[in-house]
Amino acid sequence: MIHHKEKMISPEMVTLDGISYPCYRCNTLVVGTGAAGFNAADTLYSLGQEDVFLLTEGIGMGTSRNTGSDKQTYYKLTLAGDGSDSVQEMAQTLFDGGSMHGDIALVEAAMSARCFFKLVNLGVPFPHNRMGEYVGYKTDHDPRQRATSCGPLTSKYMTEGLERSVMQKDIPIFSGYRVVELVTDGEGTEKKVAGLIAIDAATGEQVLFSATS
């Protein structure tokens, strides 16, 4: 099923290794409609890359929407109180955990507040005080109060807010497709992913998606 209000999206037929496939083309293809997938497509669109598709086995599936715990924690820069914090300090904390490269830790810390307030603006009910400070608490190995939570359904609220934003932008969503193979182009060090093949669950048909990224 293709979710797109403005127009029908029709495939072209292409032949790959002697097999004909219906083919959809776009600049950027995002696989998955959890919080990360919805956010990737939504952010790309907001930054000017509007030729983007979302591909998923099912919009209502996925860990972000369907999992819970006693307290799901969202980690961000400290945004309340009189304690000090900085991008560099948060990046160092992430790096010191031993499972993240330093450059990735720095980017995650630098984008932390921006990404958090995007979710706030989309209606995710993170707790705040009457002065507008988004209060936090300490988690394991955290020297600051960077953690926050909406309770056991935090990631569900995040996914729902991001889904609403994607739907408002009318980004095409191909739902009911299972990815089975990546399609590559080039050889050796020049080899790169050029698309993928997915199974349409409704028909059992193999469908090719061609993308620049």
What is each residue range found by the language model?
Residues L44, R178-V179, S210:
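Long alpha-helical scaffolds
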